[in-house]
């Protein structure tokens, strides 16, 4: 029995169109990279059908004539063994000709082109990576050599139906048809290898299993034709067992639970169901790292189902890329990527918010200004931070491992919250983890650092650098190593920015040991202080000559109390930008305020003592002064303005 829906083509002249370049590129990736996970076309096409019904429901809140006397929304899947086709039909919003060309012939999703362009050759072979992106309608070409779409937009006349057909190789055709029912039917003409055998998709029981696996949570009924067992008739008195077969009926039966997963109580939902739902809404082939599902009561009532992914998406640091949660109001789908429901530093969180209090006609502009939305956003932030804290502070090894995984993927993004979410700054600070100068290979929290502070230590000391090796070998660290004082080593680009906002932790000040004067307080004895004051006097002539030689390269020159082995280091004032920060801002094309470092010199180093030598000519003194400054700049992670001049000076001094 054929399960196709007949339509009448009344325009034999086909309009041929060429796919947008990005679509052709995506189609190539889909057919060549996702063949090992061909099942996903069921998930993708059912999801699209569900979205179409959600959009109709939303539009009909203002104009219920769009239902056309058929308000029972549904998705139907029909298998035709003779024609070797599978058809996915919905009675949702449908498309007109312009919609079909735009939605099926171009990629409108923001950032898609950039995503495709950034993929390396090896990444283009990574089916998992492509699958995370979400291939939607085009996934049908994994199993089909031709796809035809018959559609009519809700509210349009029957004669304004559209047929769209493509073999996925570079072009598609569009023609006008008559279609009595609104919505869309997508028919996949299966490739030979997918129409028979164990890889085939003409087995109705297999399609049912895939729907149960990927789409059981869809709140609409997903229906297939009912099959019944029909026995052969035997003559009366004949003891021969009756043979029989499964027979397809005209009755449609619902094959999914047809209830929104988030509307059920958490205790009634299995972990596998949560995982399947996550994969369906995110296109991520990995299970989520963890999740939280709650019904929030109060001035604003809403349900939150929030997931933390296992891996960071490729566009995580593209802040203009759309991020956010799916928003429903009273189970009516409103929008994807509702970024107003999460602070920016939690943009990696996925999931669903279903509110009972927001208006159905809510727009992004209304979301921006709504007090209720702010309440939901704040509640979501607290919930995620509480979830992360439960992992971070757990004694359970599995939970500790989960937090370590989370921090490796999303730690830098969380740090943005230190400056963006002052209300939760303390919660966020408790989640931060860093390497230190004394804890080899282990990450430390501020709380753990405080517990190990020396008697008399008044501050949490930290140092920022481009990488861990640079931090461990920094000249600024030498005095602290000598005295056995632990220093937190911050090696992310966002760290210095974040520390501008986080000036203390649990009432203990944080001090960057590369900025301003180093005051060890009770950790420095009186003899050391007296020796430092004496060095300031004896070195004054050399310091003055260095100031003159360096000119406007240095803000000042001082005798250092922080150096042990190195001849010199650069120090910036409190509140000023480090060389690394200046370099990063310049690379981002931002205007950077003029900032000059102070050169600190080690009076006990042979190279500095050489500057005191009366045998040193004025020319050689100037050269050595420049070399010492440049070496300090390099040790601090900065870049030389004129590397050739530096090398020339070094070579000239070596030949003396």
From Swiss-Prot:
Assembly and binders: Homodimer.
GO CC, one annotated term: cytoplasm
The family this protein is said to belong to: Belongs to the heat shock protein 90 family.
Annotated InterPro entries: HATPase_C_sf, HSP90_C, Hsp90_fam, Hsp90_N, Ribosomal_Su5_D2-typ_SF
Ranges for region A: 1-364
Taxonomic superkingdom: Bacteria
Localization in the cell: Cytoplasm
Entry function: Molecular chaperone. Has ATPase activity.
Region (B): 365-583
Gene Ontology terms, MF aspect: ATP binding; ATP hydrolysis activity; ATP-dependent protein folding chaperone; unfolded protein binding
Gene for this chain: htpG
Keyword field: ATP-binding, Chaperone, Cytoplasm, Nucleotide-binding, Stress response
The protein, known as: Chaperone protein HtpG
Region entry C, spans: 584-656
Pfam family, any one: HSP90
Keyword rRNA-binding assigned: no
């Amino acid at each position: 029995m054929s399960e196709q829906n007949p339509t009448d083509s009344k325009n034999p002249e086909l309009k041929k169109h060429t796919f947008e370049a990005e679509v052709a590129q995506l189609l190539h990736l889909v057919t060549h990279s996702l063949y090992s996970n061909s099942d996903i076309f069921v998930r993708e096409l059912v999801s699209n059908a569900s979205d179409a019904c959600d959009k109709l429901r939303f539009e009909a809140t203002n104009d219920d004539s769009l239902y056309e006397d058929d308000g029972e929304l549904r998705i139907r899947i029909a298998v035709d063994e003779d024609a070797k086709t599978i058809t996915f039909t919905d009675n949702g919003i449908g498309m007109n000709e312009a919609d079909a060309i735009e939605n099926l012939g171009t990629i409108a999703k923001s950032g898609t082109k950039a995503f495709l362009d950034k993929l390396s050759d090896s990444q283009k072979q990574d089916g998992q990576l492509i699958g995370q992106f979400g291939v939607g309608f085009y996934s049908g070409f994994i199993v089909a050599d031709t796809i035809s779409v018959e559609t009519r937009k809700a509210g349009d006349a029957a004669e304004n139906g559209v047929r769209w057909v493509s073999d996925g190789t570079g072009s598609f055709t569009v023609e006008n048809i008559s279609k009595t029912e609104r919505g869309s039917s997508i028919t996949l003409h299966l490739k030979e290898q997918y129409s028979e055998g164990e890889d085939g998709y003409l087995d109705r029981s297999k399609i049912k299993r895939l729907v149960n696996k990927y789409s059981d949570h869809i709140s609409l009924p997903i229906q297939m034709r009912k099959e019944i067992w029909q026995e052969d008739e035997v003559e009366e008195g004949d003891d021969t067992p009756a043979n029989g077969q499964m027979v397809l009926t005209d009755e449609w039966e619902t094959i999914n639970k047809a209830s929104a997963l988030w509307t059920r109580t958490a205790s009634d939902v299995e972990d596998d169901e949560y995982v399947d739902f996550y994969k369906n809404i995110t296109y991520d082939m990995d299970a989520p790292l963890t999740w939280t599902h709650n019904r929030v009561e109060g001035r604003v009532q809403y349900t939150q189902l929030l997931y933390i992914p296992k891996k960071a998406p490729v566009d995580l640091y593209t802040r203009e890329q759309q991020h956010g949660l799916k928003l429903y109001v009273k189970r009516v789908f409103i929008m994807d990527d509702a970024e107003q429901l999460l602070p920016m530093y939690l943009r990696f969180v996925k999931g669903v918010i279903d509110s009972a209090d927001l208006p159905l006609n809510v727009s992004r502009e209304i979301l921006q200004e709504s007090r209720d939305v702010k309440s939901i956003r704040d509640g979501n932030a607290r919930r995620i931070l509480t979830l992360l804290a439960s992992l971070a502070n757990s004694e359970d090894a599995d939970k500790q491992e989960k937090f370590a995984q989370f921090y490796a993927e999303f730690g830098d993004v969380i740090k943005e919250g230190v400056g963006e979410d002052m209300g939760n700054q303390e919660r966020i600070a408790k989640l931060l983890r860093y390497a230190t100068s004394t804890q080899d290979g282990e990450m430390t929290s501020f709380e753990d650092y405080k517990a190990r502070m020396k008697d008399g230590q008044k501050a949490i000391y930290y140092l920022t650098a481009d990488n861990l090796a640079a931090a461990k070998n920094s000249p600024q660290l030498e005095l602290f190593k000598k005295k056995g004082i632990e220093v937190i080593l911050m090696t992310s680009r966002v760290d210095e920015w974040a520390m501008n906002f986080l000036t203390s932790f649990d009432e203990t000040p944080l001090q960057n040991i590369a900025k301003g004067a180093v005051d060890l307080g009770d950790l420095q004895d009186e003899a050391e202080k007296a020796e430092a004051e004496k060095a300031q006097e004896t070195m004054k002539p050399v310091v003055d000559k260095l100031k003159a030689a360096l000119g406007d390269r240095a803000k000042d020159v001082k005798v250092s109390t922080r150096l042990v082995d190195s001849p010199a280091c650069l120090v910036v004032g409190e509140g000023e930008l480090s060389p690394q920060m200046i370099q990063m801002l310049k690379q981002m094309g931002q205007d950077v305020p003029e900032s000059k470092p102070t050169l600190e010199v080690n009076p006990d180093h042979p190279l500095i003592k050489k500057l005191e030598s009366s045998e040193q000519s004025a020319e050689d003194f100037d050269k050595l002064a420049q070399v010492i400054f440049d070496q300090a700049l390099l040790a601090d992670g900065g870049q030389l303005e004129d590397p050739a001049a530096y090398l020339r000076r070094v070579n000239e001094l070596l030949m003396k």
